[in-house]
Structure formats: C-alpha cells, structure tokens
Amino acid sequence: MRSLLLAVCLVLALHCGEAAVSCNTVIADLYPCLSYVTQGGPVPTLCCNGLTTLKSQAQTSVDRQGVCRCIKSAIGGLTLSPRTIQNALELPSKCGVDLPYKFSPSTDCDSIQ
C-alpha cells in the first residue's frame, strides 16, 4: 500500500503546483505520518514536525486550498478504512497543530480561508 500511495503522490505532485506550497512539499512534509495513518500507534515526531512546517508555509488562502487539494488528490484514489480516516483526522490534535482543514476525502477545499 505504501508503494501505491507514494506512486500516486509522486504523479499528483506534477499536477498540484499552482500554490506557493507545492505538492512535492506537502508529500515530503506528510510522508512521515504514513505509518501512523495506516497502522496507528504513536505519532512519529517527524510527522508532527512536518505538520508544523506545512502550517507555517501555507500562509494564504490559496496556499491552504492548494495543500488541501494535494491531500485530497493523494487519498482520493485509495480505499480507506474508517480507522485510517480517523487516524488522519486525529493527526493535527495529536501533534498540537491547529490546521484550517481536515485530512478527509469529504473536505471542501474551496471553503478554506
């Protein structure tokens, strides 16, 4: 599953670069979170560092919407279990990072300010 997710992310990185924060950056920042999202357990420190970095880089509405679209595109083609979605939704709070969007396939990226 990791190989598939990585392949999807790399392909999407080529198509999501309109905001100042590129999909390559989003993928690099969130990649350390993959083990927690797919398997649970403790959240890796590098994952929380990536979320913090991502939040600090996405300063404008356009940036935040772009980050949201990259995340949605990366997870959109995957079959996600309810537990995987729950783990993704819990990430920001477990890391103490307040994000203006949720890691969910149902997030409306256009509504993010």
Curated annotation (Swiss-Prot):
GO terms (BP aspect): lipid transport
Molecular-function annotations in GO: lipid binding
Record InterPro entries: Bifun_inhib/LTP/seed_sf, Bifunc_inhib/LTP/seed_store, Plant_nsLTP
One protein family per Pfam: Tryp_alpha_amyl
Keyword Calcium: no
SUPFAM superfamilies for the chain: Bifunctional inhibitor/lipid-transfer protein/seed storage 2S albumin
S-S bonds: C23-C70, C33-C47, C48-C95, C68-C109
Keywords, ordered alphabetically: Disulfide bond, Lipid-binding, Signal, Transport
Signal peptide annotation: 1-19
UniProt superkingdom: Eukaryota
Similarity field: Belongs to the plant LTP family.
PANTHER family: NON-SPECIFIC LIPID-TRANSFER PROTEIN 2-RELATED (PTHR33076)
Free-text function comment from the UniProt entry: Plant non-specific lipid-transfer proteins transfer phospholipids as well as galactolipids across membranes. May play a role in wax or cutin deposition in the cell walls of expanding epidermal cells and certain secretory tissues.
Name this protein carries in UniProt: Non-specific lipid-transfer protein 6
Taxonomic source organism: Arabidopsis thaliana (Mouse-ear cress)
Source taxonomy: Eukaryota, Viridiplantae, Streptophyta, Embryophyta, Tracheophyta
